[in-house]
Curated annotation (Swiss-Prot):
The gene is coq8b. This is Atypical kinase COQ8B, mitochondrial. It is a single-pass membrane protein. GO terms for cellular component: cytosol; mitochondrial membrane; plasma membrane. GO terms for biological process: cerebellar Purkinje cell layer morphogenesis; glomerular basement membrane development; podocyte development; ubiquinone biosynthetic process. Keywords: ATP-binding, Cell membrane, Cytoplasm, Kinase, Membrane, Mitochondrion, Nucleotide-binding, Transferase, Transmembrane, Transmembrane helix. The active site is at D461 (proton acceptor). It is an enzyme of class 2 (transferase). PANTHER family: ATYPICAL KINASE COQ8B, MITOCHONDRIAL, PTHR43851.
Length: 624
């Protein structure tokens, strides 16, 4: 009897010892992965477990399985969830190791996150056991975790953390579909007609939902309307992604506004428009290449991928390789887009006028005239190639910005080929450290000022995907030069004085120079003059103080929005033609800084540009 009780006690002690060995051995392994003595510690831990396992006779471990319910599902893991776990805290959310090199893969924003097999990490519905070092009570997970996580994996994770935005190859958004581009005006009109009918039905449903207890958006956005409900926004996006061209370009412009301009539900859906349109089938792409480059176009390439890695409003981009091995990006324009600019904009405006009432002070006709001219520029790839070469020459030797090389032998009116660049668009840089984000945004804003006041030649499309950041080289690659334009000297002479006056609080000079620029006729109501000057002063705040300006917390957009109703009500003349593209670019640059939550002083940046401009101005006048 006594002997049997002793044996039971010993058996129980054996189980306790085995469990203790397992948990403490697990701790040793995790410590080993982070230690310079990793290999030796790992071997020691394995030896201890081997000896203890023999002594304890392979104790019953069923309690371990019971304790970690659902352990058989741990082979599948959501990559984003892994980043939240203690051991994986050194990994960026999109880190994966495929071939031992620790390469990263880019997942398009909004794409569904897949599962990773064999990663050995718990699934999302599994909670990690807390570790309390102060109580000396350690509990860890199953052996398979450490078995799949070597010291080399940890080192690669640490390196990846320092290069969250390391260069990766672009991928087409998973939402994009292969669909023939409607190339004739009649086929494009049919799509817009179907959209108008769908919007009407959707608006009736939205009004009914609001009338019977549905909640109306509380955001007082300018484009907030029952006709622009989320369901109707889906209809708009699907149509724009199908027809592409000028209509899609307008949708992409809306996507980079903040929710002070459009309601947040629409903004999320228009974000899909910005990221990727549908792409044309291979036969349609081949037809364009043959018409532009001739029947022997394939002989100029070593290879080309049939499916594009990016699809935008006017064209899609394919990866290719030259006979010498150089990688290229070939942008191919959708058929019928250039010929349909005027009709597309008229069709879209007809739909938009159903949705919102456009105030007279918006001068929509003037805006559309400027927009049509700019879209015609963007459809001329020969013009874009010249602009890209001009920018490449202006920024030659620049320590930050790089313009890819253009290959003339593979470029024409509807095809432009440039060298392939590696990096990530700026909206993927939000997780970089504060110092790096500040540096990126400082350079972007400084370039904006240099383009206007030094080059008097600006790339006016502020789409975040037109700026690719390469963390390994610490360079920003500039892409898409279709929207480039010159600014006359007389315009910049007055405009720089407006910005300078705003930075020093000189309201009288702001008003005078605004009249010189034809923003005002001189016959406007006092309310309009005050609102205009106040809007300019708000925009000048970033350049007014020597202290760091916090773009992430500023309320610039909201404050200007409060002035818009007054300006639209009392405006007597459309703004100067140059201001449309200029203000789009400047607003986009500020939004980049806001999205990346940058903090830096802008005053000296502007003063350097201003003083250099005044010196050049004096030199020009002395020569005359």
């Amino acid at each position: 009897m006594l002997l049997s009780e002793v044996l039971q006690v010993l058996r129980g002690a054996g189980k306790v010892g085995a469990a203790f060995t397992s948990t403490q051995g697990e701790q040793l392994r995790l410590m080993a992965c982070n230690s310079t003595f990793g290999a030796g510690m790992k071997a020691a831990a394995e030896a201890v477990e081997g000896v203890m396992g023999t002594v304890m006779g392979g104790g019953d471990m069923t309690s371990k399985t019971d304790e970690f319910a659902g352990i058989e599902k741990w082979e599948e893991m959501d990559l984003d969830e892994a980043a939240k776990w203690s051991v994986a805290s050194e990994m960026p959310p999109d880190f994966s190791s495929k071939d031992g090199r620790g390469e990263t893969s880019e997942t398009p924003v909004g794409a569904a996150t897949g599962t990773i097999k064999g990663a050995g990490w718990p699934a999302q519905n599994t909670r990690f056991l807390h570790v309390s070092a102060s109580q000396h009570h350690f509990r860890f997970v199953h052996d398979s975790i450490v078995a799949r996580l070597s010291p080399e994996d940890i080192q690669r994770a640490r390196e990846a953390k320092q290069n969250i935005a390391r260069p990766v190859r672009q991928k087409l958004n998973e939402r994009a579909k292969e669909r023939k581009v409607p190339a004739t005006r009649i086929s494009r009109l049919a799509n817009f007609g179907g959209l108008a009918v769908g919007l009407g039905i959707g608006a009736i449903a939205e009004v009914a939902k609001q009338s019977f207890g549905g909640k109306r958006s509380e955001v007082g956005a300018l484009l907030d309307s029952p006709l622009l409900s989320e369901a109707n926004a889906e209809r708009i996006v699907n149509t724009l992604c199908k027809v592409r061209g000028a209509a899609l370009k307008i949708g992409q412009m809306l996507s980079i506004q903040d929710n002070s301009f459009i309601n947040p539900q629409l903004q999320k859906i228009f974000e899909r428009v910005r990221q990727s349109a549908d792409f044309m089938p291979a036969w349609q792409m081949h037809k364009v290449l043959e018409e532009e480059l001739g029947s022997g176009w394939r002989e100029k390439l070593s290879s080309i991928e049939e499916k594009p890695f990016a699809a935008a409003s006017i064209g899609q981009v394919h990866h290719g390789v030259l006979p010498g091995g150089k990688e290229i990006a070939m942008k191919i324009q959708y058929p019928g887009v250039a010929e349909s600019i005027h009709s597309d904009i008229n069709n879209l405006m007809s739909v938009l006028k159903m949705s919102v009432v456009l105030p007279d002070g918006l001068f929509a006709d003037s805006s559309l005239e400027v927009l049509q001219r700019e879209l015609a520029w963007e459809c001329d790839y020969e013009r874009e190639a010249k602009c890209a070469k001009r920018f490449r020459n202006l920024l030659k030797g620049d320590p930050v910005f790089v313009v890819p090389e253009v290959f003339d032998e593979l470029s024409a009116r509807r095809v432009i080929t440039m060298e392939l660049v590696n990096g990530v668009p700026l909206d993927r840089c939000v997780d970089l450290d504060q110092e790096t984000r500040n540096e990126i945004c400082f350079n972007i804003l400084q370039l904006c000022l240099r383009e206007l006041f030094e080059f008097r030649f600006m790339q006016t499309d502020p789409n975040w995907s037109n700026f690719f950041y390469n963390s390994e080289q610490n360079k920003i690659f500039l892409l898409d030069f279709g929207a480039c334009r010159d600014y006359p000297e007389l315009f910049t002479d007055h405009y720089i004085e407006v910005v300078h006056a705003a930075s020093v609080g000189d309201r009288a000079t702001v008003l005078k120079k605004s009249k010189d620029l034809k923003f005002l006729t001189g016959f406007e109501a006092k309310a309009f003059e005050d609102a205009h000057v106040e809007a300019v002063m708000i925009l000048g705040e970033a350049f007014a103080s020597a202290e760091a300006f916090d773009f992430g917390t500023q309320s610039t957009t909201q404050r200007i929005q409060s002035l818009i109703p007054v300006m639209l009500r009392h405006r007597l003349t459309p703004p100067p033609e140059e201001s449309y593209s200029l203000h789009r670019k400047m607003a986009g640059s500020f939004l980049i800084c806001s999205k990346l939550k940058a903090r830096f002083s802008c005053r000296n940046m502007f003063l350097d540009v201003y003083n250099a401009y005044k010196r050049q101005q004096q030199e020009r006048r002395s020569q005359v």
